[in-house]
Amino acid sequence: TVFCGGRNGRDWEFLIRIAQAMPEVTFNCVMPKDKFEEYKENFGKNMVVKSDIPEQEFLEFMCQSQIVVTPLDTEAPAGLIAFYQAAANGKMAITSDTVTTQEYFADGRGALCGRDIEDWKNTIQYYLQHREEADSSAEKFKRFLENECSEEKYAKTLWGMLVG
């Protein structure tokens, strides 16, 4: 089971095409109501889709999945909150290869895919079948966030800029 959820920057149309190419995998999705209405006719039998649910339910739904999959439709930072939530819950992230995501997911901290359905399909299948590697990737990403994105690191960097 894989999870995709959130608001801004998600490429829902592309995600639906990935799900259609992987009928044997369940896709748990949480999308905004307008996107739900726009795409509901295209949901496959392997898609469990909810919209506009409370955050606690969102997190519980995410935790029922092995991997968080987030195709993006923008180069701008998007999906970061979902990635942080995934890391906090020990879930590996697979997302679009963008300038922003390259920085976060380098060195085995996640997987990046291009605009090719087969690439996404193969990557998702690989990590669903290799749980230890997915867990290791999730742990690396969690450590990276704790070390590089902490309030302490931010304060030190800001202080260095002010006095430097």
Regions found by a protein language model. Give the residues of each.
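Short acidic/histidine- and often glycine-rich active-site loop of Leloir-type glycosyltransferases
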Residues: 38, 97-108, 112
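Conserved donor-binding/catalytic core segment of Leloir-type glycosyltransferases
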Residues: 1-10, 16-20, 28
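Conserved donor-binding/catalytic loop of nucleotide-activated donor transferases
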Residues: 63-65, 85-92, 96-97, 106-107
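Nucleotide-activated donor-binding/catalytic signature segment of Leloir-type glycosyltransferases, i.e.
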Residues: 31-61
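Acidic donor-binding loop of glycosyltransferase active sites
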Residues: 62-78, 91
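A charged, aromatic-enriched C-terminal amphipathic alpha-helix characteristic of glycosyltransferases
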Residues: 129-162
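Conserved acidic donor-binding loop of glycosyltransferase catalytic domains
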Residues: 72, 95-97, 113-115
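Conserved acidic donor-binding segment of nucleotide-sugar-dependent glycosyltransferases
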Residues: 107-118, 126-132
